[in-house]
Amino acid sequence: MFQHITVLLEEAVDGLAIKPGGIYVDCTLGGAGHSERIVSQLSGGGRLIAFDQDDAALDNARVRLAPYMDRVTLVKSNFRYLEEMLLTCDVPTVDGVPQVDGILFDLGVSSPQLDEAERGFSYNHDAPLDMRMDQGGALTAYDIVNSWEEREISRILHVYGEEKFARSIARKIVQARENAPIETTGELAELVKTGIPAAARRTGGHPAKRSFQALRIAVNDELGAEEDALEEAVKCIRPGGRISVITFHSLEDRICKQLFASYVEKCTCPPDFPKCVCGGTGKLRLVNRKPIVPTEQELEVNPRSRSAKLRVAEKL
């Protein structure tokens, strides 16, 4: 069963300013919570197009969204191919570019992927090292820890995991694999612990948290996919349409913040103006200058939402 608590549900969907007859895209279907809220507000010619790489998520959506399937299109794809896939979904185009009214991203791994041991995402379960969101993908966490050079392992732990003990952990990994391959998440989690000083292991949550995050990002090229997809989202949103983006760690948020800023910096209109009138060439308006974060009530229900941030931008 695909059990998942949707993060910032109302805030992210309300940020899209849904029009009943509009065309909306959920780039990260997951448990279908955001999709259900979007599609329940559509009528007439309104449509929802939802992307996911995970067959379990798509199967779950067919059940959860069954009452609305006459206006839902499910697409198995990485969202980095947003423009290409929308062209296959019979949406209006302008100069060959598909145009929709709203696009939502809920980045990060869904709870079922974290909780199902066999997916190999979690340091809390002993399972084969995998971490692929798309089970058809070629690269796995096993490949990285058992075949990449020490300096490359250290680099991804430092850059993607912001792990201060990246060099020490990478050294422990390489030393261990000289004796036998590192095959499970449990083995890897124990190795990571040995690369972190005892004093540092007492604070900041599970000592393997940052390393597992780094490997997951590397396996799925998450940051590259995010950047590609946001660029395409800006192209595919029609004027007045909005992009809602939920991020879960500083690297994701930085990419979103900087990309949005690159499209608004040339516009000098006040933030409450509905459209650009200054003659600048900005393409976006920030709907919220500062990111929206979960309420205390949401945190009580879903502690995993603590690091979530929502940014919303509107096409000018």
Curated annotation (Swiss-Prot):
One of its GO terms (biological process) is rRNA base methylation. It catalyses: cytidine(1402) in 16S rRNA + S-adenosyl-L-methionine = N(4)-methylcytidine(1402) in 16S rRNA + S-adenosyl-L-homocysteine + H(+). Pfam families: Methyltransf_5 (PF01795). GO terms for cellular component: cytoplasm. S-adenosyl-L-methionine binds at A32, G33, H34, D52, F79, D106, Q113. It is found in: Cytoplasm. GO terms for molecular function: rRNA (cytosine-N4-)-methyltransferase activity. Specifically methylates the N4 position of cytidine in position 1402 (C1402) of 16S rRNA. This is Ribosomal RNA small subunit methyltransferase H. It comes from Paenibacillus sp. (strain JDR-2).
